[in-house]
Structure formats: C-alpha cells, structure tokens
Amino acid sequence: MIDQNKLITKWKKAFAKAKNLTTLVNLKNTLHNSDLKPLLQKIKTATKLSEKSSLGKLYQSLDIQLTDLLTSYKKTFEINNQVSQKPSLDVMLPATEFTNGSNNALYQVIDNLVEYFKSFLFTINFDSELTSISDCFDLLNIPKDHSSRNESDSFYIDKTSLLRTHCTATTLKAVRTSKKTNNPDIRVVSLGAVFRNDSDDATHSHQFTQLDFMWIKKGLSLANLKWFINNMITHFFGENTFTRFRLSHFPFTEPSFEIDIRCWLCQNGCSICKQTKWIEILGAGIIHPQVMNNMGIGDTENITGIAAGIGIERLAMLKYGIDDIRDFYDNNFKFLTQFTD
C-alpha cells in the first residue's frame, strides 16, 4: 500500500528545488508519471470492484494534492520573483497627455441654433434623407418646369423619390402628419444633410447641412417673422448685428425674403461681402396658403405660418472665417482641432 505522507513529503522536497515556473510545471508532470500513473494501471487490472473503488479514491486524493502543491509553489515563486525584480515601468514619469475631443464646427453651430429653437418649444425633427417628389416639390408649390426638378440639379433614386434638396420637404411631412386642431400651434425644426447636383468648389458642395423651421399658429404675421429671425441672428452672432430683409421669391412662401447681415469686416465693401457691405445668410417668408392647405391646415385666413431655411456651413464659414466649404469634410486634424467648445 502507498504511504501518502511519505509520497507528499517527497513531492514537497522536489518542488522546493525548482528554479522557475517552467520547471515547476514539468516537475508536476514527471511526478504524476512516476508516482500516479502506476496507480492507474493497478486500477485497470484490479478484478474486484471494491479494490477498484479503493484505488480510485486514493488516486483522486493524491492527484488533487499534487495539483494543490503545484499551485501553492507557483504562487510562492511568483511573489518572490516580483519582489526581486525591478518594476518595468517608471511610475514617476509624467503621464501621456490625452487630447480632449470637441465638436466639429458644424455641430457647434447646430447646437447653438437648436438651443435657440428649444427655448421656444420647437420639436427637433430628424427624418430620412430620402424623400418623395411630392413632398420635395409638388406639395411645396414648386412648378413642374422649375430648374430644381431637373436631373442635372437633383439626385433621383427612381421616378418617385430622390435625395432631399432641402429640409423643407422634411418639415412639410412632419406638419402634414401631425395632429390637427382648430387652434393649432405647430413648431417644427428639421435638420440634416441635403443634396444638390453641384460641382464641389470653395463655396459649393453636392452635400451640405440645412436647418429648416415652420411655426404655424393663428395670428402670426410678418412682424413676428422679422422679430423671430432678428432674435435668432442676435443669439448666434451677438449684439449689434445689423440685418436687412430683401424681397425675394420662393414658391412655398408669400411674401418671401432673403435676410442679410451687415459685413463686420469693412465699412465700404470687401471681398467677403462682394463690395455690397451686406452678406446673405438665409431665406424666409410667410408660408404660402396653398402649401398650408397641402399640409392639412385649413382656415388660412386666420391661421398663418412663418418659415425659414438656413445653411449651416454658411453660418459656420461666416462665424469662424472659413473660406472653403470643403475644409469641413477633409478630415484635416489640424483644421478640426481649432474649434474647441
């Protein structure tokens, strides 16, 4: 019969002489083969069930003790090894400085404007960049022969759908599908990418970002539109920003205006304002009665709406003095890191 105490003492002496972890593992395998493997052979050749059971329990007990000894000596060896080794890292060296991230200049402009519209309880609406010809053109009163409908100006997907050319299509859809009442107060902002079939240059891009809003309510007038736009411009550009409303024409508003701000770089004209002393920033107007009807708004004698469309890149270029729209999309890290929140 095997003397367990004598065998374990032998194993301990053998493990104590090991010089490294590899030797410990190899030694465990050697001891198993020399001392426990013969026991397995006895189990196989035993003829009595009671003998097999007794030998099996003995083997299991010894195998567990051998494994526990290996684990114990490995821990001791690792602790001693850690104490004797010098740290591979000098913890007194200064840490690597992390670069703080910040929003892209376009998103800083968007956040500024969204903050303004939220203060007036507008719903911020994001929708698919794919729209129908009906929402993009027909319901917005845009004539069949208008140049924006041409395939040379827009990106058509099929005969009924295209990539939206303005966010007004998205705003119209939001208003059209909203719950209607006899006394509506609908405030919607649409925001996202729009697409025009333009050649990319310093001031044009086939894709850019637009913000569009509609406010529909009884009694809204041109005075409300002017106040709201002027207030938004002051919020964005700061006090003492002078504005000018010029009559224009958009199929979906009547009357229609283009809004300019006074050039802050010059007194008598410069290359930025093209010698006019004014810089165009957005288009706005009173929503056309036919468009109101198309959106399901009745009683256009009393219920009116104000609206505007704003190019985000244009505002960012003016605010930050950027002269090439392509800079926003070129992933130039030096350019992007100039704009910290």
Swiss-Prot record:
Q: Where does Mg(2+) bind?
A: 254
What Gene3D superfamilies does the record point to?
Answer: Bira Bifunctional Protein, Domain 2
Q: How does it assemble?
A: Tetramer of two alpha and two beta subunits.
Which family does the record claim for this protein?
Belongs to the class-II aminoacyl-tRNA synthetase family. Phe-tRNA synthetase alpha subunit type 1 subfamily.
Protein name per its UniProtKB record: Phenylalanine--tRNA ligase alpha subunit
* InterPro entries in alphabetical order: aa-tRNA-synth_II, aa-tRNA-synth_II/BPL/LPL, Phe-tRNA-synth_IIc_asu, Phe_tRNA_ligase_alpha1_bac, Phenylalanyl-tRNA_Synthase
Q: Per the annotation, how and in what number is the cofactor bound?
A: Binds 2 magnesium ions per tetramer.
Any matching Pfam family: tRNA-synt_2d
Catalysed reaction(s) here are: tRNA(Phe) + L-phenylalanine + ATP = L-phenylalanyl-tRNA(Phe) + AMP + diphosphate + H(+)
